Amino acid sequence: LVYRGRKMLDFNIDEILEGEFNQVDIFVKDKDVHFTPKREMPVISMVMRDSFDHLLVKKAQEFGAELLQNSEVKSIENGILKFANSDEEIEAKFIIIADGALSPVSKLAGFKDDRLLIPAIEYEIEVPEEDFERLSKSVRFDIDAAPFGYGWCFPKNNHLSVGVGVLKTKAKVKLKDYCESYMKDLGITTIISESAHGFVIPVTPRAELVKGNCFVIGDAAGFADPIVAEGISNALLSGKIIAEAVSEGNLDLEKTKEKYLEKVNEKLIPELKIGIKLAKFFYENTTIRNLFVKKFGSLAAERLTEVFLGKSTYPSDYKKKLQEKLKMTFSWM
């Protein structure tokens, strides 16, 4: 959980914290490049996703939300939700679809899925004490740990979360092989216990965000950060945006649609589009990128950390800035 997302929560999460890290280690594989941006506040906070989700549900219930468990949506017709395991029907004025990257409910609502989904795999592993001690000092990202992607090593209470993601899906993807190779690069040769899960991350937004009285938000909308594939921050932001839209629209559907699209196109879409372009440069043009990071990597790491903190956004004049830096890079050679 990066700081920009954590500070959007108006409640304490200490009860589920598994670690806080003020420093991030960023490596570029096979290059003599290592950056360690550091801040006074926790850049990244570690939580287990099931504990985090449970806390979110508990807080929502405290504000009057009703939780329906084991209630798989079977169909949506004219604003009426029907369920697979009961005869219950619910008529809703607004249906907010926030069911994650695969988003089966958006399919039932008739949304076309034009998002780019990138594959990732993560292992929760218990390692010998000396390995855990060595790797538990900071959060670590390794660029090029997988082709056209990166790896991560996140220390938790008593284990490590190690994974890889690939941001260019045209290449043949062997996630398990990439992750096993990455673990060897980390010096992990003995694993006491492990559990693995694969998943996809949507890094481009849908063209259509509203259909009838259905609104998609978060990963269901394709709002994950295209550069680092982090989705919780924009999920929280888009949740706040739709809540504001419903309130400011005075429960009127057309006004709510207008408000939601207006706010999303102002606060989210422009930065996502810039992020997509920057990710393409960063992960696909590795030769030029490596020259760039040799000279300006420290500055780029500091700027990315400011984005993690919610203090900055990706630059709207990124083309101009990249061109200037690239000219300086080649004139320096």
Where are the model-predicted features located?
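FAD/FMN-dependent oxidoreductases across multiple families
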Residues: 170-246, 250
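Conserved N-terminal helical subregion
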Residues: 15, 19-20, 26-108, 117-118, ...
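Glycine-rich FAD cofactor-binding loop and adjacent beta-loop-alpha segment at the N-terminus
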Residues: 1-18
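Conserved FAD-binding catalytic core of PHBH/FMO-like flavoproteins
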Residues: 102-175
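A short coil-to-beta-strand element that immediately follows conserved catalytic motifs
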Residues: 67, 116-120, 187-198, 257
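C-terminal helical "tail/cap" subdomain of flavin- and related membrane-associated enzymes
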Residues: 247-333
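A short, flexible beta-alpha/helix-coil linker loop
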Residues: 41, 160, 221-223
